[in-house]
C-alpha cells in the first residue's frame, strides 16, 4: 500500500502526518484550528485518502506557522507515498459550493509550481495560500487553482479543498504504466 509517515518539529510547531493514498477518505486526529480541520476533512474525503494528524503550534500568536508547516509535512508525505508507484498523473475538477465555483488542475510532475488565478484578489492574505505553497513545493506537483466565481470566503476555500481532493485523488490513482515521455517523473 502507498503509505507514509512524516513529522516536522520547529520551535513554533510540531506536525506529524500518517497518509494512506489507498484509503477511504478519513481524517483523524487533533488539529487546533477548527476551520482548517473542517477543510482538511473535506480534502481527505474527496481524495479518498486516510490521514491521521498530530499537530500543535503557537496558534495563540497566529495560526500561520501551523498551517504553513502542515502544508510542508503533508506535501512531503504525499511525495513519499506516491513517488514509487505508477499513477494517472493528470486531473482537473470543477467544484461549485453555492455561489463559489473553483477549478483545480494538477500534474504530479516532479516540478513544483503553484498558480492561483484570483482576478478579484479575494484570497490575498489568506492562510490557504501558505498551506498550498508548502504542499506544492514539498509534493513536487504542479497545481493551478482558478477562482471562477464566489464571494463567501468559506465557500471559496471549501470548494478549493474539495476540487483539490477530487483532482489529486484521481491523479494519484494507481495505473499499470506511468505516462511520461521521459519515462519517469522523479
Swiss-Prot record:
Pathway: Amino-acid biosynthesis; L-histidine biosynthesis; L-histidine from 5-phospho-alpha-D-ribose 1-diphosphate: step 6/9. It is found in: Cytoplasm. SUPFAM superfamilies: Ribosomal protein S5 domain 2-like. It catalyses: D-erythro-1-(imidazol-4-yl)glycerol 3-phosphate = 3-(imidazol-4-yl)-2-oxopropyl phosphate + H2O. One of its GO terms (molecular function) is imidazoleglycerol-phosphate dehydratase activity. Gene3D superfamilies: Imidazole glycerol phosphate dehydratase, domain 1 (3.30.230.40). Pfam families: IGPD. One of its GO terms (cellular component) is cytoplasm. Keywords: Amino-acid biosynthesis, Cytoplasm, Histidine biosynthesis, Lyase. Its EC number is 4.2.1.19. GO terms for biological process: L-histidine biosynthetic process. It is an enzyme of class 4 (lyase). Belongs to the imidazoleglycerol-phosphate dehydratase family. PANTHER family: IMIDAZOLEGLYCEROL-PHOSPHATE DEHYDRATASE, IMIDAZOLEGLYCEROL-PHOSPHATE DEHYDRATASE HIS7. This is Imidazoleglycerol-phosphate dehydratase.
Amino acid at each position: 500500500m502507498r503509505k507514509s509517515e512524516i513529522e516536522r518539529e520547529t520551535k513554533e510547531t510540531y506536525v506529524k502526518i500518517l497518509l494512506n493514498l489507498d484509503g477511504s477518505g478519513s481524517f483523524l486526529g487533533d488539529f487546533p484550528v477548527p476551520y482548517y480541520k473542517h477543510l482538511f476533512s473535506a480534502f481527505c474525503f474527496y481524495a479518498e485518502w486516510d490521514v491521521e494528524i498530530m499537530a500543535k503550534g503557537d496558534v495563540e500568536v497566529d495560526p500561520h506557522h501551523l498551517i504553513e508547516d502542515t502544508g510542508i509535512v503533508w506535501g512531503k508525505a504525499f511525495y513519499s507515498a506516491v513517488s514509487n508507484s505508477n499513477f494517472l498523473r493528470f486531473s482537473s475538477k470543477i467544484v461549485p459550493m453555492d455561489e463559489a465555483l473553483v477549478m483545480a488542475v494538477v500534474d504530479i510532475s516532479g516540478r513544483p509550481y503553484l498558480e492561483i488565478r484570483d482576478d478579484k484578489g479575494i484570497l490575498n492574505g489568506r492562510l490557504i495560500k501558505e498551506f498550498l505553497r508548502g504542499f506544492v513545493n514539498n509534493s513536487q506537483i504542479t497545481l493551478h487553482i482558478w477562482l471562477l466565481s464566489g464571494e463567501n470566503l468559506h465557500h471559496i476555500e471549501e470548494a478549493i479543498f474539495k476540487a483539490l481532493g477530487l483532482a489529486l485523488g484521481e491523479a494519484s490513482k494507481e495505473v499499470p504504466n506511468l505516462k511520461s515521455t521521459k519515462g519517469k517523473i522523479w
